[in-house]
Amino acid sequence: MIDAVLAKVFGTKNEREVKAMLPTVAAIGALEPQLRELSDIDLAAKTIEFKERIAQGATLDDLLIEAFAVVREAGRRVLNMRHFDVQLIGGMVLHKGKIAEMKTGEGKTLVATLPCYLNALGGQGVHVVTVNDYLARRDSEWMGRLYKFLGLRVGVIVHDLDDQERKDAYNADITYGTNNEFGFDYLRDNMKFRIDDCVQRVHNFAIVDEVDSILIDEARTPLIISGPSEESTDKYYKINRIIPKLVRGEVIDGKEPGEKYTTGDYTIDEKHKSSALTEEGVLKLEKLLNIGNLYDPQNIEWNHHVQQALRAHVLYQRDREYVIRDGDEGPEVVIVDEFTGRLMPGRRWSDGLHQAVEAKEGVKIQRENQTLATITFQNYFRMYKKLAGMTGTAETEAAEFYKIYKLEVVVIPTNRSMIRKENTDMVYRTEIEKFRNAAKEIKEYNAKGQPVLVGTISVEKSEHLSGILKKLGVKHEVLNAKNHEREAGIVSQAGRKNAVTVSTNMAGRGTDILLGGNAEFMTKDECLKRKVAEKLTEDQVQYVADEHFYYFTHNEQFYRVRRDLWDEIYKENKAYTDKEHDEVVELGGLHIVATERHESRRIDNQLRGRAGRQGDPGSSRFYLSLQDDLLRIFGGERMQNLMLRLGMEEDVPIESKLITKRIQKAQEAVEAQNFEARKHLLEYDDVNNKQRQTVYGLRRQLLEGEDQKQRVMEMVQGIIEQYIDMRCPDAKHPDNWEMGDLRNDILTQFGYKIDLNELASLSREEMTNTIFDRLQAKYQEKEDLVGADVIRQTERIVMLQVIDNQWKDHLLSMDELKQGIGNRAYGQKDPLVEYKKESYELFTAMMDRIEDETVRYLFFLQVNTGSGPVMPYPDEEEDGDEDSVEEEVRPDPTEQQRLAAKSTMEDFTRNVQRKKEREMEQLQFVGGDGSSTPQQVVAGQKVGRNDPCPCGSGKKYKKCHGS
């Protein structure tokens, strides 16, 4: 109440923030006349001037007014687009590291040029993050003309670029790319063996387009790089045959308060999208699988596969969560993004769920993959020194943006007043009535020529409504995951007279719906039909203004056409679309018909936002039924009772603001539930993130070539101290120390047989120092033989290889820990606290193994001089006195032997690097919107027990690292 009164007197916080920027907007405008007087060369030279001033101590804030004015003038000259004052405000909001909420059609793409240019002047790079490759290419080409005019370099990161192309793109001043590609490049860089192979620079400043989609909707989807697992697919087939034999039950209230009973073999909780076996179901499965107790530790894999198969059968439906389409190796399961309706061909559900769906659908089951590297978008984007975002719908999630990312949301005023009419929801009893009446309204609007965009929540529902419209004789386009390739073309013409477009949620982003049609798209199509457009390679594309040719893309292919011809065709089309625009405006603009409320208000707002852009008229209406998931699951009994009181008859809707408010309350409840799920994920991933930062930080030190000899010697010292503590504890008298075991420990770990007589009268500290001195001398002998440079390179390669292998195993252990940690709640323990505690223990154990394995590799690595090994190995020692070792007197190696030894070590490092490169080619990339298509997964060749050990020791695998 008090907040409302204060807002009326002083304005809201958002209004005050926007008002505070108006003097800066005026200052930018004041520079416009003098900048217009500059030649193109002088205007572009401002970039050099700004960089020089930064070098002399000026801050980016000091340059903001002048830099924004320069970009505004460059936009006018190069793009024929002058930034509106509200766009300048949007640019300032982004520069401050906040989220700018700008309505559809307000020019977010152009707004980004202002902070991009200003922040690129600092020389550390700016990343512009988009939701798909199409937008990354389009925006880099479109806005790239402006940046290149001002002397900045522009790069774009899309799938199928090699490392050098990626590196060049990241070294540009401004880099466009998808969230997937940026995240995967970060993970890939932390799997490389050479610093020169790394492609990313520092994470300086990122502007995330459609920030709500990337940082909210996809926050629960981690990016995963995986390699092939050895697990068989037989269990999936066996369990898949059994699940259909189970009978669905329900949860029934007992006589006592809080008492619950279950019937059947399993139950479904639609509110939380989960399924659970009943006691009867568990007993039936144990009998059918013939495995005894399903919850015995030895049956943990069976239990896991059963739970996933149950989910696949009862929670995941074809043409809703996924579609079946032809792939390279036959039919395949492709996920449909629940928020956009787009296909996600590169993405697979984890933990065996995708395989369970494949078994259910009878398509070829792909083997589960083992995670090699993973990160959530939440933790990736929090690495940037400064983060900003743009979207048309962020205000409803403002609290989450601030709590998780410390990002404030500022709503930018529209350039022209919004005059869209938002009609009250129409609620029917059944889904059949809802679709029947929605189709009638679509036909009525279509009959008078008004364009209609229809929103549905799934492929299945879009095709159902399409069938009804066909029967009514309404000509229309269908846009869903099955024909997404035509998305941009269909959406761009959805504002034409008589157009009816039935779409899933995917029509919400990327392409404006212009009333009367999009003249640019029409001109592209006409140029292609007339065959006057010349196909180009990417290298031939010109970004700067070209008086002879106009460049454009179509279906990710580059073209150019003579500028005079383009201008002629465009002028004709523009005159036509302008005339049609006025006719559509007279009819009332674009009308939105939504056939269901989404769980998130943002998705509903995105659909509404397609109408009424830039001051155009428009209208929207939602058609709902009591059978819709949101109303049925989350509306509750109060909603049902309210409907009955209002009185419902067949084909007679209830049109009530009270109902609309109740629906919004249900949506808020779902959003709160989803926020808790994302927050819960982040709490667990923060544990992994700290460990990832430690491991990746260590790798980075190695890649940057820091001298690791001291680190290796510290490892040696630490291992010796562990052995001394274990075999010669303070609590025991020296006569009871386990000296023989100590000797064997050192022999096994370092390949060195210590002289027990030499240690007989020494204290623990003296023993540690003596053993360390002997091992250090042995290591120095190897270094003297091959040279310091070669041994340093070998240390680096060995440590990287060991870290990667141990990290891979650690991620598997962490996955297994996370799967079962929820059960700790039954023992009155906090699962998160337990997870933190046990994951720390796992991490400590991994770091110890890294040290042990690294030292063992380095000490056992065979150096061949061309005349046999230089140093003895444990299984090659001659039998002799167990307590004494006669020190071998070895002549100094010849120069020829040194060269042979050096060559051996260099061959080893080269072989390891080649092996790593082959492994990198076999990786699979999973996550986000699936725009990164997986590369072929090829199982690595298994090492036989009698094969030479890959570590290079020269021994058989079974006697070295296979022991």
UniProtKB/Swiss-Prot annotation:
It is found in: Cell inner membrane; Cytoplasm. InterPro entries: Helicase_ATP-bd, P-loop_NTPase, SEC_C_motif, SecA, SecA_CS, SecA_DEAD, SecA_motor_DEAD, SecA_preprotein_X-link_dom. Its main location: membrane. Keywords: ATP-binding, Cell inner membrane, Cell membrane, Cytoplasm, Membrane, Metal-binding, Nucleotide-binding, Protein transport, Translocase, Translocation, Transport, Zinc. It comes from the Bacteria. Gene3D superfamilies: 3.10.450.50, Helical scaffold and wing domains of SecA, P-loop containing nucleotide triphosphate hydrolases, SecA, preprotein cross-linking domain. Zn(2+) binds at C949, C951, C960, H961. Its EC number is 7.4.2.8. ATP binds at Q87, G105, E106, G107, K108, T109, D512. GO terms for cellular component: cell envelope Sec protein transport complex; cytosol; plasma membrane. Residues 874-886 have a biased composition (Acidic residues). GO terms for molecular function: ATP binding; metal ion binding; protein-exporting ATPase activity. The keyword Chloroplast does not apply. Its cofactor is Zn(2+). Residues 868-909, 924-963 are annotated as: Disordered. Belongs to the SecA family. Part of the Sec protein translocase complex. Interacts with the SecYEG preprotein conducting channel. Has a central role in coupling the hydrolysis of ATP to the transfer of proteins into and across the cell membrane, serving as an ATP-driven molecular motor driving the stepwise translocation of polypeptide chains across the membrane. PANTHER family: CHLOROPLAST PROTEIN-TRANSPORTING ATPASE, SECA INNER MEMBRANE COMPONENT OF SEC PROTEIN SECRETION SYSTEM. Monomer and homodimer. Part of the essential Sec protein translocation apparatus which comprises SecA, SecYEG and auxiliary proteins SecDF. Other proteins may also be involved. HAMAP family: SecA. This is Protein translocase subunit SecA. It comes from Solibacter usitatus (strain Ellin6076). The lineage of its organism: Bacteria, Pseudomonadati, Acidobacteriota, Terriglobia, Bryobacterales. The gene is secA.
